[in-house]
């Protein structure tokens, strides 16, 4: 039943995303704009299903999880195996010095960390860095796994805690999964007769939303591996299209719970809106890091009335 539900949602979302891609490339601007907005939102659903598969809860069998995870990854596009390793590393490193994008440490230049936050999380470059990394692995896996890339280039781009682990994954598995993902994107481009401009602007719109969401659900939260996240308040339609991804604290506390159980696991901790966190990131940039274990900065997020 779980696999059937997620398969139906995956088919629906990938079909809707394809329709939005077509609309942006072929319709007048007053129809293309809603299609662009639709793609920005609906393309989060395949990613949410990929996220379920990464945790082994998209289906009740390992084979079912792997199959739906590989197909869901086509929409990003990425490799299921790459994403699984990267995301499980995130659960291990969350809010530690290895994975801290809203704060900067004493030995880190603030200007560089602001580039990572503004460029990566708020302007969508985080998504494109992942995409370019996937392309590099596909074209030149030896370069991706090289000492220079792992120890010099990846850390300079903010991926120093991830790439060393990713470079150890089986190359043929990653390459074959990326081949499927890139072929799917090429098929969409050809079959829907997409324009390059329309396709790229859709990717950028999705990048803006996806990149911001990846850290808005953590910024200024408790410096704690398991409890360092928020259950963000969003419109019901946004939460549904992302399959309750905004219930992120509940997910970190219960990573084996499927998406439809997360709302019942939301605790009584303060719940900022997505926009409250998002605009504080824009307004203030990175801030000096508190010690590991420090509580969420509620006075910063919810300033007292004067």
Regions found by a protein language model. Give the residues of each.
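Non-catalytic, topology-defining segments of multipass membrane proteins
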Residues: 1-41, 74-196, 256-306
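Transmembrane alpha-helical segments that form the membrane-embedded catalytic/substrate-channel core
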Residues: 40-53, 79-83, 195, 199-224, ...
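Juxtamembrane helix-capping/reentrant segments at transmembrane boundaries
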Residues: 58-78, 99-117, 225-239
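Cytosolic juxtamembrane regulatory segments of multi-pass membrane proteins
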Residues: 159-161, 232-247
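C-terminal transmembrane module of eukaryotic multi-pass membrane proteins
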Residues: 246-249, 255
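Active-site His/Glu-centered metal-binding helix of metallohydrolases
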Residues: 53-54, 93, 220, 253
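Active-site-flanking alpha-helical
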Residues: 54, 58-59, 225, 254, ...
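His-Asp-centered metal-binding catalytic motifs of divalent-metal-dependent phosphohydrolases/nucleases
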Residues: 50-56, 87, 251
């Amino acid at each position: 039943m779980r696999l059937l539900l997620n398969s139906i949602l995956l088919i629906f979302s990938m079909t809707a995303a394809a329709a939005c891609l077509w609309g942006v490339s072929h319709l007048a601007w007053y129809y293309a704009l809603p299609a662009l907005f639709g793609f920005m939102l609906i393309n989060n659903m395949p990613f949410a299903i990929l996220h379920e598969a990464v945790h082994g809860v998209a289906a009740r069998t390992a084979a079912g999880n792997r199959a739906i995870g590989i197909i869901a990854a086509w929409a990003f596009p990425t490799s299921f195996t790459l994403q699984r390793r990267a995301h499980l590393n995130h659960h291990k490193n969350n809010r530690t010095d290895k994975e801290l994008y809203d704060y900067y440490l004493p030995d880190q230049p603030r200007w560089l960390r602001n580039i990572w936050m503004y460029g990566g999380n708020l302007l969508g470059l985080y998504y494109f860095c992942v995409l370019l990394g996937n392309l590099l692995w596909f074209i030149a896996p030896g370069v991706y796994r090289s000492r220079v890339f792992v120890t010099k280039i990846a850390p300079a781009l903010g991926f120093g805690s991830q790439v060393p682990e990713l470079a150890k994954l089986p190359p043929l598995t990653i390459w074959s999964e990326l081949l499927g993902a890139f072929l799917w994107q090429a098929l969409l481009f050809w079959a829907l007769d997409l324009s390059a401009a329309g396709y790229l602007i859709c990717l950028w719109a999705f990048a803006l939303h996806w990149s911001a969401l990846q850290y808005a659900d953590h910024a200024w939260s408790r410096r704690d591996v398991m409890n360092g996240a928020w259950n963000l308040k969003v419109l019901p339609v946004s939460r549904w299209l992302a399959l309750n991804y905004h219930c992120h604290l509940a997910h970190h506390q219960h990573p084996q719970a499927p998406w439809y159980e997360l709302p019942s696991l939301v605790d009584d901790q303060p719940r900022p809106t997505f926009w409250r966190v998002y605009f504080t990131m824009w307004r203030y940039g990175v801030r000096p890091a508190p010690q590991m274990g420090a509580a969420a900065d509620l006075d910063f997020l919810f300033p007292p009335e004067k």
